[in-house]
Structure formats: structure tokens, C-alpha cells
């Protein structure tokens, strides 16, 4: 099995990249794909760049060139569900766009034409992620993760997203685009991200301060998954 891993930023993939043996590097547009072995397992690690378009470009290149059997999206997220704190883990059961709106034509909020309203994560991958996170002593919340091309940093923005998607756990900028590409290529995926901020007015300062912790927590979980896949 070859495991595909996607992170947007250099900080989000650095730990995993540095553990990779026999590493090769391929650049496609703004994306970088590192291939090699981690703990003896074949891994293709994508640093996609930030945002939905960059994530879609990179994930398409990853699936076409490296041909992984599954995809794990790692990195950081804003925690909006009650009780989440910095360093906690969110695992996707499904992902949706919070900034897509074609409701004028009868689609659900967040749904794009010719696509499902939600992209469902692979249950086996999500179950495995939850099992490993709990064994590692990490605090975990599982459910809906919403994506959009905005860094959420105000209570008003959170309130709007929660009004549209009451069950949302975390918000970020790439996961649903990655999920849409995986759906199109019929490749199982899951999102495992660590909370870096609360999406509120202090989010930008919190993100800068706690991104290294979020990267460490999410990378530890991904490493545990690699060992089991």
C-alpha cells in the first residue's frame, strides 16, 4: 500500500518529510510531492499550498503521479465546536464547503452541481485515526469539517457558519477540495487536523503561536496511522 498525505504549508509537512527515507521530490505548478518510505511504508507526501485551488491542483497531481491507495489530509484547523481547545484533534466523517452557494437552483448550502452536498470520509480510515488518537492520549472530536477560502477570525463569521452547518467541528481552507478530488478519483480519504485557534478575533495571533503544536500533534497521529496501514 502507498499512503498519500496532504498538508498545505511547509510547517504542516516538515516533521513527516524529515522522517522520510530515500526521499525524492517532484514539483508540479505550486505543489511539491515528496516520495519515499516512513517506517518502512511507501508514502507520497504533498505540500499543496494554501487554499482550495492549490489543494485541488496538488491532490490531482498526487493521485495521477504517485497513485496512492488512500489520502490523509493533515495540518491545522480552527476549532469551532464546543469544548475544543488548541492541540485537540478533529477527524472528518464528512467535509463540506462553507463558502459555496448554488441554493438558487435547489442545491444544499455548500453543494456544487454534479457533486454530493457532503464528501464522506472513509470509515475505516476515520475509525483508525480515532483509535490511534485516543491511544496517544489526544482529545478527539469527530464529525463535519468545513472548508472555504477564508481564514476565519471573527465571532460573526463563526456564527454564520454554525447557522448554515450546526454540526461543524472545525474550519480550514483545503480539506473539502482534497475530498472532492479524491471523490472524483474514487480514492478513500480522511482529514485529521489539530486545532491551532478558535476561529475568533484572536485567531490570527493564536494560529501563529500554536501552528507548531498543531503540526506536531497531527503529525504524531499520521505516523501512528502509517504504522497500521
Swiss-Prot record:
GO cellular component, one term: cytosol
Keywords: Amino-acid biosynthesis, Hydrolase, Methionine biosynthesis
Enzyme Commission code: 3.2.2.9
Signal peptide: none
Binding of substrate, residues: 78, 152, 173-174
Catalyses which reaction(s): S-adenosyl-L-homocysteine + H2O = S-(5-deoxy-D-ribos-5-yl)-L-homocysteine + adenine; S-methyl-5'-thioadenosine + H2O = 5-(methylsulfanyl)-D-ribose + adenine; 5'-deoxyadenosine + H2O = 5-deoxy-D-ribose + adenine
Gene Ontology molecular function: any one: methylthioadenosine nucleosidase activity
Active site annotation, chain numbering: 12 (proton acceptor), 197 (proton donor)
Pathway connected to this protein: Amino-acid biosynthesis; L-methionine biosynthesis via salvage pathway; S-methyl-5-thio-alpha-D-ribose 1-phosphate from S-methyl-5'-thioadenosine (hydrolase route): step 1/2
GO biological process, one term: L-methionine salvage from methylthioadenosine
InterPro entries: MTA_SAH_Nsdase, Nucleoside_phosphorylase_d, Nucleoside_phosphorylase_sf
Recorded superkingdom: Bacteria
Family: Belongs to the PNP/UDP phosphorylase family. MtnN subfamily.
NCBIfam families according to UniProt: MTA_SAH-Nsdase, PRK05584.1
Function (record text): Catalyzes the irreversible cleavage of the glycosidic bond in both 5'-methylthioadenosine (MTA) and S-adenosylhomocysteine (SAH/AdoHcy) to adenine and the corresponding thioribose, 5'-methylthioribose and S-ribosylhomocysteine, respectively. Also cleaves 5'-deoxyadenosine, a toxic by-product of radical S-adenosylmethionine (SAM) enzymes, into 5-deoxyribose and adenine.
The protein's name in its UniProt record: 5'-methylthioadenosine/S-adenosylhomocysteine nucleosidase
Source species: Haemophilus influenzae (strain ATCC 51907 / DSM 11121 / KW20 / Rd)
Recorded name of the encoding gene: mtnN
Amino acid at each position: 500500500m502507498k499512503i498519500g498525505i496532504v498538508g498545505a504549508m511547509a510547517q504542516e509537512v516538515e516533521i513527516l518529510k524529515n522522517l522520510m527515507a530515500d526521499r525524492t521530490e517532484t514539483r508540479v505548478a505550486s505543489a511539491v510531492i515528496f516520495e519515499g518510505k516512513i517506517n518502512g511504508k511507501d508514502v507520497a507526501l504533498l505540500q499543496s499550498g494554501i487554499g482550495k485551488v492549490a489543494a485541488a491542483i496538488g491532490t490531482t497531481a498526487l493521485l495521477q503521479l504517485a497513485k496512492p491507495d488512500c489520502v490523509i489530509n493533515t495540518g491545522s484547523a480552527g476549532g469551532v465546536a464546543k469544548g475544543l481547545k488548541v492541540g485537540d484533534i478533529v477527524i472528518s466523517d464528512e467535509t463540506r464547503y462553507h463558502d459555496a452557494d448554488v441554493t438558487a437552483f435547489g442545491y444544499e448550502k455548500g453543494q456544487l452541481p454534479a457533486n454530493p452536498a457532503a464528501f464522506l470520509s472513509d470509515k475505516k480510515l476515520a475509525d483508525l485515526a480515532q483509535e490511534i488518537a485516543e491511544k496517544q492520549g489526544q482529545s478527539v472530536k469527530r464529525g463535519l469539517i468545513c472548508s472555504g477560502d477564508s481564514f476565519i477570525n471573527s465571532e460573526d463569521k463563526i456564527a454564520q457558519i454554525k447557522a448554515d452547518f450546526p454540526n461543524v467541528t472545525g474550519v480550514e481552507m483545503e480539506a473539502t477540495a482534497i475530498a472532492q478530488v479524491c471523490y472524483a478519483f474514487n480514492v478513500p480519504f480522511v482529514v485529521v487536523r489539530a486545532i491551532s485557534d478558535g476561529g475568533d478575533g484572536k485567531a490570527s495571533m493564536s494560529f501563529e503561536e500554536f501552528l507548531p503544536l498543531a503540526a506536531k500533534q497531527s503529525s504524531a497521529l499520521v505516523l501512528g496511522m502509517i504504522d497500521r496501514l
